[in-house]
């Protein structure tokens, strides 16, 4: 299982804790606002908004919160003016890191993100310094208990247009192209597989093995970035031993 997938699986399991802290709803609300702002308030004609609403519903976000976020996005009701910013940099061991934020104050957020990088032995870089290392992919996690036959799952996923199926322990992840993401997700749901998380994300084209003190520093860096209120998503190309990753979960 790739370093990306192991980390993605741990983040997925930590989502419940994020929800309890209230951060998940804040992230989802900001994503809906931004999606509606740039593509309009109709999910039928705005794929990004449709995906954001689906994620919000899966997280049991109240309907009124979703509707309010859409209205704020299209400017129908007043609210804070948010904008998207992507930061790029390096962590310990030369790990490439991308951080997507939604903020109402770019200067404040940039200073805080830079401080987090520096605190944990990393450095914030210029725009484009690591973006080339990542590519967009669809990521679909399936509840292991809903998989009766792993070979059949692999066949179903590949037939639907998936690029890869990664099974490890209690984790099952389907990787797709962005274009085939929705089709594969729909087919798997129709066949009875229980999807626990699905999104278009960024996957590294190559990974950097990291161990020992550097591995712990990288994980602390990633955790603090993800705990920041303005951070929506983080991506990194590390490959860290399972025992160190599991100590985080």
Swiss-Prot record:
One of its GO terms (biological process) is regulation of DNA-templated transcription. Coiled coil: none annotated. One of its GO terms (cellular component) is cytosol. GO terms for molecular function: DNA binding. It is found in: Cytoplasm. Keywords: Cytoplasm, DNA-binding, Transcription, Transcription regulation. NCBIfam families: PRK00110.1 (NF001030), PRK12378.1 (NF009044), YebC/PmpR family DNA-binding transcriptional regulator (TIGR01033). Belongs to the TACO1 family. This is Probable transcriptional regulatory protein DICTH_1505. It comes from Dictyoglomus thermophilum (strain ATCC 35947 / DSM 3960 / H-6-12).
């Amino acid at each position: 299982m790739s370093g990306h997938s192991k980390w993605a699986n741990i983040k997925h399991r930590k989502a419940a804790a994020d929800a309890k802290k209230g951060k998940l709803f804040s992230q989802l609300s900001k994503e809906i606002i931004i999606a509606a702002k740039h593509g309009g308030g109709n999910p039928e004609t705005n794929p990004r908004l449709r995906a954001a609403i689906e994620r919000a519903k899966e997280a049991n976000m109240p309907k009124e919160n979703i509707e309010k976020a859409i209205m704020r996005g299209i400017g129908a009701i007043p609210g804070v003016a948010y904008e998207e910013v992507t930061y790029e940099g390096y962590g310990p061991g030369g790990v490439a890191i991308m951080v997507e934020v939604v903020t109402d104050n770019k200067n404040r957020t940039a200073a805080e993100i830079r401080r987090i990088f520096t605190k944990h032995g990393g450095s914030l870089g210029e725009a484009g310094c690591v973006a080339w290392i990542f590519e967009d992919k669809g990521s679909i996690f399936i509840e292991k208990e809903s998989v009766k036959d792993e070979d059949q799952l692999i066949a179903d996923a590949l037939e639907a247009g998936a690029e890869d199926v990664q099974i490890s322990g209690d984790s099952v992840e389907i990787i797709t192209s962005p274009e085939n993401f929705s089709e594969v997700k729909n087919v798997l749901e129709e066949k009875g597989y229980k999807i626990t998380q699905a999104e278009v994300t960024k996957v590294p084209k190559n990974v950097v093995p990291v161990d020992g003190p550097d591995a712990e520093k990288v994980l602390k860096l990633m955790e603090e970035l993800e705990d920041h209120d303005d951070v929506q998503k983080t991506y990194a190309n590390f490959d860290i031993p399972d025992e160190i990753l599991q100590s985080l979960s």
